[in-house]
């Protein structure tokens, strides 16, 4: 590459453009708000969040769960949140016995209860193991929030809230997903333990 500076700037510009599109979409902003309110309601009722994804989306699931359990902006009691992507014994047992497509559905069946919130992350919206988990959420009356790319894929029909990032580029979608996850964490933390804190630039 002859001009790496321009290449780097192009990536930043593309990422900023996706976020600007979200910022201008009032329906999408309202959807993020309403999804956050469902998480708050669940926690106020003594429930928990369950999160899942594959690859980079698995990392996002673990990242968001970590913010809930540990802390986000300030010290406060931990909030119950489980990333369904972390226990290698459970993952390999389910994968071996029931197939990869049941990796998360089996855990939702075992650990989820009515009133919990499941956050499924899939850039395509078509990850089979996420879709299977979403189907199980409907059976158990677990609220479902999906984070996807522009089309929403099959998640459109299965999620209570399908938050679709306006991009078809996987890295740009993932960058927006973690920002949305951070925003949800901030709203939940502030509502439950309100200290009025944020890190303004």
Swiss-Prot record:
Pfam family, one: SIS_2
One Gene Ontology biological process: D-glycero-D-manno-heptose 7-phosphate biosynthetic process
Cofactor stoichiometry and binding remark: Binds 1 zinc ion per subunit.
Gene3D superfamilies: Glucose-6-phosphate isomerase like protein, domain 1
InterPro entries: GmhA/DiaA, Phosphoheptose_Isoase, SIS_dom, SIS_dom_sf, SIS_GmhA/DiaA_subfam
UniProt KW Cell wall biogenesis/degradation keyword: no
Residues that, per the record, bind Zn(2+): 63, 67, 174, 182
Residue span, SIS domain: 39-198
The entry's keywords: Capsule biogenesis/degradation, Carbohydrate metabolism, Cytoplasm, Isomerase, Metal-binding, Zinc
GO cellular component, one term: cytoplasm
Catalytic activity: 2 D-sedoheptulose 7-phosphate = D-glycero-alpha-D-manno-heptose 7-phosphate + D-glycero-beta-D-manno-heptose 7-phosphate
EC number: 5.3.1.28
Organism superkingdom: Bacteria
Binding site for substrate: 54-56, 67, 96-97, 122-124, 127, 174
Requisite cofactors: Zn(2+)
Record text on subunit structure and interactions: Homotetramer.
Family note: Belongs to the SIS family. GmhA subfamily.
Functional note: Catalyzes the isomerization of sedoheptulose 7-phosphate in D-glycero-D-manno-heptose 7-phosphate. No activity with L-galacto-heptulose, L-galacto-heptulose 7-phosphate or D-manno-heptulose.
Protein name from the UniProt record: Phosphoheptose isomerase 2
Organism: Campylobacter jejuni subsp. jejuni serotype O:2 (strain ATCC 700819 / NCTC 11168)
Organism phylogeny: Bacteria, Pseudomonadati, Campylobacterota, Epsilonproteobacteria, Campylobacterales
Gene from which this protein is expressed: gmhA2
């Amino acid at each position: 590459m002859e001009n790496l500076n321009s290449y780097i700037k192009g990536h930043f510009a593309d990422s900023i453009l996706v976020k600007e599109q979200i910022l201008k979409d009032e329906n999408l902003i309202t959807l993020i708000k309403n999804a956050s309110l469902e998480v708050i309601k669940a926690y106020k009722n003594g429930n928990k969040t369950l999160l899942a994804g594959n690859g980079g989306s698995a990392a996002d699931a673990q990242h968001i769960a970590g913010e809930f359990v540990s802390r986000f902006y300030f010290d406060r009691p931990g909030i119950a949140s489980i990333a369904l992507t972390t226990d290698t014994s459970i993952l390999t047992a389910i994968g071996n016995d029931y197939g990869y497509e049941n990796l998360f559905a089996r855990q939702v069946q075992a650990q989820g209860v009515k009133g919990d919130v499941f956050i499924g992350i899939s850039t395509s919206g078509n990850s089979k193991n996420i879709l299977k988990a979403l189907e199980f959420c409907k059976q158990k009356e677990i609220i479902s929030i999906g984070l996807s790319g522009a089309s929403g894929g099959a998640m459109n029909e299965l999620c209570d809230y399908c938050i679709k990032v306006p991009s078809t580029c996987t890295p740009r979608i993932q960058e927006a997903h973690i920002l949305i996850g951070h925003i949800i964490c901030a709203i939940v933390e502030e509502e439950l333990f309100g200290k009025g804190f944020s890190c303004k630039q």
